[in-house]
């Protein structure tokens, strides 16, 4: 993982170009699902928040990128995510494989649908 960065741009810039492209696309897709997301670094990784409370995190690593947390409880989504799950609610996307963007979008949408109502009640 990259050292603590002051911004998401700075964080992403510490990775190789191919990883930067994936992280930027993840960032774009989070904003597409959550247009009013606030960006910050929390726990040394990019964090997207609403009303000051986290919704979703992304992170870059040497061999993969991660998205977390991902909710469970949707049988079809859970089954589709199973090959990418690592630990409780973490998706690991290996850098040597094509990113399953449709699945990523579904996972992000599920997290937004779960978390935002909790924040805004």
What residue spans do the PLM features occupy?
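Charge-dense, helix-prone N-terminal extensions
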Residues: 1-121
